[in-house]
Structures are given as C-alpha cells and as structure tokens.
Curated annotation (Swiss-Prot):
Compositional bias per record (Basic and acidic residues), positions renumbered to this chain: 85-120
Name by which UniProt lists this protein: Small ribosomal subunit protein bS16
The organism of origin for this protein: Micrococcus luteus (strain ATCC 4698 / DSM 20030 / JCM 1464 / CCM 169 / CCUG 5858 / IAM 1056 / NBRC 3333 / NCIMB 9278 / NCTC 2665 / VKM Ac-2230) (Micrococcus lysodeikticus)
High-level lineage: Bacteria, Bacillati, Actinomycetota, Actinomycetes, Micrococcales
InterPro entries according to UniProt: Ribosomal_bS16, Ribosomal_bS16_CS, Ribosomal_bS16_dom_sf
GO cellular component, one term: cytoplasm
C-alpha cells in the first residue's frame, strides 16, 4: 500500500486550516486517514504549525512519502533534516510572540481622587449666604402682593 503524508482540508471558504495526516495515496483528499500527526493554520500570522515529531519520524522511516507542501512544513519544523541526518534539525519555526499585558498609567489617571471635605469652614460661609437669599426671595413676593393691589386701585 502506498502511504502518503498529506494535508486534509477543514474550515470555511477562504478560511482554511489543515490537518497533517497519514493516508493511503488512493483515498480522496478529505477521506479517512490512517493517523493524524499535526495541524497547520496558514491564515494566522505567523502560520501555526504543529507536527508530532515522533510520529512523523516513524512514518517517514516506514516509507511514507510526504507531499510537496508537507515536505516544506517538515523542513520548517526540522523533522525532514532529522530524518535525512542533515544539519539544521532544530528547524526555522517562528512562534507567535505573546503580547504584554496592558497596564494603565496611574499618574495620568482621568478620574481624580476625592479630596477630604472641610465641613467647618464651608458651613459658616453657607449660613450668611442663605440669609440674603431668603430675604431676596421674600422681597419679590411682597412686591407681587402689592402689585395686584395697585392694579385693583387703578381699575376702580
């Protein structure tokens, strides 16, 4: 039986991701696989490649032939060089760098801390301020009461 290591396509239209599988060369692309040995997501930046090195080495040793794309993936991960006994077995796989956690600067905070209230000084200043306001409120009321009386006198 001719065994190949190839890609099995999954995902939506224009959003593919693949599984690296070992299957009979005569089966269809998305058919039944003998074994799944990895994953490949080409749309991520950098591309996500995860291949079980031990299983890939086993299948290559028993005669499984990788397709061109899988051979390129095996070279990136370093499995092909390890199988052939060449230098550079560590591969050139780039890993995604993790983003640093966001830390808001404390000194430039938008929300200002509450200041302690001084109750004694404002309390004294509020009482005199209220007294003239009450007097001013009473004065227009008195004038309003006098105004209708004057109108009544004029109309008689």
């Amino acid at each position: 039986m001719a065994v190949k290591i190839r890609l099995k396509r999954f995902g939506k239209i224009r959003a593919p991701f693949y599984r690296v599988v070992v299957m009979d060369s005569r089966t269809r692309r998305d058919g039944r696989a003998i074994e799944e040995i990895g994953k490949y997501h080409p749309t991520e930046e950098p591309s996500f490649i995860e291949i079980d090195s031990e299983r890939a080495q086993y299948w290559l040793s028993v005669g499984a032939q990788p397709t061109e794309q899988v051979a390129a993936l095996l070279k990136i991960t370093g499995d092909w060089q390890k199988f052939k006994g060449e230098s550079g077995a560590e591969g050139t796989l780039k890993s995604k760098s993790e983003k640093e956690a966001f830390v808001a600067p404390e000194r430039d905070s938008v929300i200002l801390p509450e200041e302690p209230k001084q109750e004694e000084a404002p309390a004294e200043s509020e009482q005199p301020a209220e007294a003239p306001a009450e007097e001013a409120a009473e004065a227009p009321a008195e004038e309003a009461a006098e105004a209708p009386a004057e109108d009544a006198e004029k109309s008689e």
